[in-house]
């Protein structure tokens, strides 16, 4: 895409704002290289990449990338035999640390949110290499500034000797400086360092009283820095040890550099992936600042930008407009007052397309649609060249000639005030001829003009649409609202009336214009009113469609969760049934074994085929992974509303609330109300209640099978839960429902942790969608 176009559309300012959001020089480098792509697959992938990271960024706290830096130069130097210093090794260590933190974050993200997939980030995480050994080798050898003493046995020994020798030197020099006899001879009673040697400051007149080497003197010459002869040899020893230390440090750093060189390819991959992540996160941060949304890219030529606004203007004051090339429309001509926002509309369209093809979310409402353009050409603003002494018209025409040479059917062309700067009649004719030529090429065109002749241009040409920017005659100022499909109309009479011009003059002026022009203005005014009404209705329709899609997605997820839960329950029931049958079979085997032993010992009259028969009957009940429950329905009176029934498919008791028809009834099971087939219901005979059981049944009726904890404080909720569970156990309930609501999830977590430890609870689970979903926990009592 032409650099001139990007400059006119101020894309560099957008890049600068994205660059401000980067953390590392890796991310900054990628922002500086960011350019609009023109390949359809590349554009789509870049947008998916940014959108996926933006979703995660908007929902979760991402790991810090602080300290991430470009290390490829160090890696290449290590590969050719150079030796890295501690600072460079620490930057490599930080790269490994950052990538490991991101991998840990992603793994936790996947575990917590199993239903959501992030394929692009997943691919990047799979690319990240395992560099744990290299990290530990660097981390255990050096800190931010230097090698650890225990980096090697030799280094530890050398530094220990340096420390002990320094201590002896200090003790020796301390005795000298603290001696009463030397107090008047010293400039200061301290030990200092000159030329890496320990020295004492001696007044020049007492030089002869101290044997040793003079290493320095003060600016005035009154103080000499002398290394006493008593410590010269020890200082020499320190120098030798420092040399040995440097050699050992070089050896250790060479070894660490070798480890880096061995992992060079993996480190370069890690740098590339983490730099790309920094770049994408910067895009996500910027996108959130402009409330960017993801457009849908289409192979067919399409432009639909609902409520788009220019991202460099103040979002609080800028007017958002819907920009759309409707079906079969290739040219849009915008008319309206000067300073009414026509040029901003052109720049908004051009800049949003450049942003979208660079992988940036765009400042529009959800649902935008775009095609991919090979190039965007602009003739916007006054680009008059003083050096070339070109007029405004010549400057524009030079630019237009260049555009017409290169534009094709894959181009978007933006003309600002087409044909301006010359005689109006010639300018209008040129404008129409240029538009005809570009339409023949097949480019998509948006042009602004103030020529009234161009209002009629769309009426005798296919694929051309008028648009206008609105003017408020009450405030005598533009509203900056774009009206697609509505040509601009003259407001001269209304403005003159508002400013106080005599009605006689205005009415006479109206008689001087043709009837046709008057009717056209009235028609345009009617179009404006209808456009506003239709636009409001369409925005409301878009909102409702979006809400419906969201509800559909939520229901689909809940249905999938229900199916998974149902499947797990069935598998669990099968497993439990198999275990019971296995236990029964084993018990039967033991019984048969005992009977055989009894027959052998006692001579009991037990026939072998009878034993085998009984064993086979038990085996027939066992089904590997498929247990069928054959239920023989009891025949009682006809089921009516109010009857207590057993729901055969669920094995639960319930009460019939309503008979829907001959085949279906509505049944209440606990807190669940369901419509079920009558053939799935078995009428229960009412049992006579024994007097001795009255206490239990009375108690059972005093509490419900559900406990509502919504609105409770955490501690109060747990106290209430304990009391309720005690009563539920006394009432012989097998299952109860704890309603805690969704909220932040804190109360749900607390309730479930408490149930896990409670002595009366054997199991619990989250509620199914029909039971209240995530806002309910179902507890099974022992």
From Swiss-Prot:
Its EC number is 3.1.-.-, 3.6.4.-. Residues 707-782 form the Smr domain. GO terms for molecular function: ATP binding; ATP hydrolysis activity; ATP-dependent DNA damage sensor activity; endonuclease activity; mismatched DNA binding; ribosomal large subunit binding; rRNA binding. CDD domains: ABC_MutS2. Pfam families: MSSS (PF20297), MutS_V (PF00488), Smr (PF01713). Keywords: ATP-binding, DNA-binding, Endonuclease, Hydrolase, Nuclease, Nucleotide-binding, RNA-binding, rRNA-binding. One of its GO terms (biological process) is mismatch repair. ATP binds at residues 336-343. Homodimer. Binds to stalled ribosomes, contacting rRNA. Endonuclease that is involved in the suppression of homologous recombination and thus may have a key role in the control of bacterial genetic diversity. Belongs to the DNA mismatch repair MutS family. MutS2 subfamily. This is Endonuclease MutS2.
């Amino acid at each position: 895409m032409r650099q001139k176009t990007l400059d006119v559309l101020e894309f560099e300012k957008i890049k600068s704002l994205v660059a401000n959001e980067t953390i590392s020089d890796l991310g900054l480098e990628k922002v500086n290289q960011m350019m609009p792509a023109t390949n359809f697959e590349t554009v789509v992938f870049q947008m998916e990449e940014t959108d996926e990271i933006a979703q995660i960024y908007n929902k979760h706290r991402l790991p810090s990338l602080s300290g991430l830096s470009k290390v490829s130069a160090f890696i290449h130097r290590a590969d050719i035999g150079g030796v890295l210093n501690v600072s460079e090794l620490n930057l490599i260590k930080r790269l490994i640390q950052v990538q490991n933190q991101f991998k840990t974050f992603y793994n936790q993200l996947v575990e917590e949110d199993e239903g959501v997939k992030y394929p692009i980030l997943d691919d990047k995480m799979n690319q990240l290499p395992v560099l744990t050994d290299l990290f530990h080798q660097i981390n255990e050898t050096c800190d931010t500034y230097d090698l650890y003493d225990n980096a090697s046995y030799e280094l530890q020994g050398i530094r220990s000797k340096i420390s002990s020798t320094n201590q002896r030197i200090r003790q020796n020099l301390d005795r000298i400086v603290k001696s009463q006899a030397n107090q008047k001879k010293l400039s200061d009673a301290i030990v200092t360092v000159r030329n890496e040697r320990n020295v004492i400051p001696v007044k020049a007149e007492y030089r002869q009283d101290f044997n040793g080497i003079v290493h320095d003197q003060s600016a005035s010459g009154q103080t000499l820095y002398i290394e006493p002869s008593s410590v010269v040899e020890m200082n020499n020893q320190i120098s030798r040890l420092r040399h040995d230390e440097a050699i050992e440090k070089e050896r250790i750093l060479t070894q660490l550099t070798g480890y880096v060189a061995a992992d060079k390819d993996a480190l370069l991959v890690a740098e590339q992936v983490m730099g790309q992540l920094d770049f994408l996160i910067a895009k996500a941060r910027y996108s959130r600042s402009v409330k960017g949304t993801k457009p849908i890219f289409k192979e067919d030529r399409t432009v639909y930008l609902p409520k788009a606004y220019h991202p460099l203007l103040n979002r609080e004051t800028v007017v958002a407009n819907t920009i759309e090339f409707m079906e079969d429309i290739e040219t849009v001509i915008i008319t309206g007052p000067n300073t009414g926002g026509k040029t901003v509309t052109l720049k908004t369209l051009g800049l949003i397309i450049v942003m979208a093809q660079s992988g940036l979310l765009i400042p529009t409402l959800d649902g935008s649609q775009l095609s991919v353009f090979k190039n965007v050409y602009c003739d916007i603003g006054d680009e008059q060249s003083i050096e070339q002494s070109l007029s405004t018209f010549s400057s524009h025409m030079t630019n237009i000639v260049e555009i017409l040479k290169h534009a094709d059917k894959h181009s978007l062309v933006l003309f600002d005030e087409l044909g301006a700067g010359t005689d109006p009649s010639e300018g209008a004719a040129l404008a129409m001829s240029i538009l005809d030529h570009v339409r023949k090429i097949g480019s998509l065109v948006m042009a602004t003009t103030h020529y009234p002749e161009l209002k009629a241009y769309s009426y005798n040409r296919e694929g051309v649409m008028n648009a206008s920017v609105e003017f408020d005659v009450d405030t005598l100022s533009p509203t900056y609202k774009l009206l697609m499909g509505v040509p601009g109309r003259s407001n001269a009479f209304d403005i003159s009336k508002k400013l106080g011009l005599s009605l006689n003059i205005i009415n006479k002026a109206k008689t001087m214009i043709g009837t046709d022009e008057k009717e056209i203005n009235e028609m345009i005014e009617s179009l404006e009113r209808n456009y506003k009404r239709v636009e409001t209705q369409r925005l409301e329709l878009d909102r409702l469609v979006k809400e419906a899609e969201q509800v559909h997605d939520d229901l689909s997820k809940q249905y999938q969760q229900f199916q998974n839960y149902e499947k797990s329950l069935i598998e669990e029931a099968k497993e439990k049934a198999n275990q019971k049958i296995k236990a029964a079979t084993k018990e039967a085997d033991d019984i048969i074994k005992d009977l055989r032993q009894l027959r052998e010992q006692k001579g009991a009259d037990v026939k072998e085929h009878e034993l085998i028969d009984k064993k086979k009957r038990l085996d027939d009940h066992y089904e590997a992974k498929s247990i069928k429950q054959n239920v023989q329905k009891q025949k009682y009176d006809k089921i009516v509303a109010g009857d207590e029934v057993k729901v055969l498919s669920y094995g639960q008791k319930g009460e019939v609330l309503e008979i829907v028809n001959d085949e279906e009834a509505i049944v209440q099971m606990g807190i669940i109300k369901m419509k079920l087939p009558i053939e799935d219901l078995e009428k229960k005979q009412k049992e006579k209640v024994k007097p001795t059981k009255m206490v239990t049944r009375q108690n059972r009726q005093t509490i419900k099978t559900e406990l509502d904890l919504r609105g409770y404080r955490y501690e109060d909720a747990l106290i209430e839960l304990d009391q309720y569970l005690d009563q539920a156990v006394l009432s012989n309930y097998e299952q109860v429902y704890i309603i805690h609501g969704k909220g932040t999830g804190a109360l749900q977590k607390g309730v479930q942790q408490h149930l896990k430890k409670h002595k009366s609870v054997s199991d619990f689970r989250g509620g199914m969608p029909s039971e209240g979903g995530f806002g309910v926990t179902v507890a099974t009592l022992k």
